[in-house]
Amino acid sequence: MKIRVHATIANFGPGFDVFGVGIGEPYDELSFRESSEWEIRVKGHDVPADVRNTAVVAARALAEMAGEEVALRMKLRKGIRPRSGLGSSGASSLAGALAMARVLGVEDERLILRAAMEGERAASGSAHGDNVVPAYYGDFTILESYEPLRVRRIPVDFDVVAVLPAVEIPTSEARRVLPPKIPLKDAVRNIALASSLVLALKENDLKAVGRLLDDRIALPYRKRLMPWYDRARKAALEAGAYGFSVSGSGPAVFAVGGDVAQIGKAVAEAFEGFGIEVDVYVTKAGRGALWF
């Protein structure tokens, strides 16, 4: 059996640690079978090929939650680069949790997602869900609460281009630059942006969605780690993008609206001005985990 779990765009503009959406590319693929001992083989991007792998961590977590003693032999094709801002650890975590769920016959979505979040805890120190949740559903997702786990979803299907520069921004560093408090006016603005963005998505108004891809909570501070951000955004908008923002904590960025292939080329050229190579993914939003 094989499962494909796609990349995700966490935050999606103003939804810091709350919004997310699944996209078609890049993706991880995991094949697996029940075994007497744990084993994982990895092809593609460099991640641990042992029990530290988030796919193994999440699979073991689900088995423990279900009160079962089961091991898996897994083969992971790691297509999402680690530390990309595209939900790499979340994709592998969800793949592992789904694999164990299939073996055990577990259908409880909350249990599966909680197990996947344990993989995220192993990777980042925090059992966050803003990547594994949209990776599971594919929809635009809103993490309403963790205790209890509540998720709101809006089905989406629109073109998006994600551009991944050949640089790394450690999540710990991206968190460190955030202030403990933000000005009230910025909080008010983000509430307006986030609530309007949800309505625009429900109305399928992509131009409004693009206009609302702004953020006053994290982006102003994280831009210090991304000296190329403003030039890349300018290139995207001049090429016809409706909106542009950073994916997760970066370094990946994304744009919606217009000719996303041409927008991707324009953004790539902006990065070239900084001597930075990129991978460009012209894809679709609204892609969740798939069995095949």
UniProtKB/Swiss-Prot annotation:
One of its GO terms (cellular component) is cytoplasm. Pfam families: GHMP_kinases_C (PF08544), GHMP_kinases_N (PF00288). The keyword Thylakoid does not apply. Pathway: Amino-acid biosynthesis; L-threonine biosynthesis; L-threonine from L-aspartate: step 4/5. It catalyses: L-homoserine + ATP = O-phospho-L-homoserine + ADP + H(+). ATP binds at residues 81-91. Keywords: Amino-acid biosynthesis, ATP-binding, Cytoplasm, Kinase, Nucleotide-binding, Threonine biosynthesis, Transferase. The keyword Cell membrane does not apply. InterPro entries: GHMP_kinase_C_dom, GHMP_kinase_C_sf, GHMP_kinase_N_dom, Homoserine_kinase, Ribosomal_Su5_D2-typ_SF, Ribsml_uS5_D2-typ_fold_subgr. GO terms for molecular function: ATP binding; homoserine kinase activity. It is found in: Cytoplasm. Gene3D superfamilies: 3.30.230.10, GHMP kinase, C-terminal domain (3.30.70.890). Its EC number is 2.7.1.39. One of its GO terms (biological process) is threonine biosynthetic process. Its main location: cytoplasm. Catalyzes the ATP-dependent phosphorylation of L-homoserine to L-homoserine phosphate. This is Homoserine kinase. The gene is thrB.
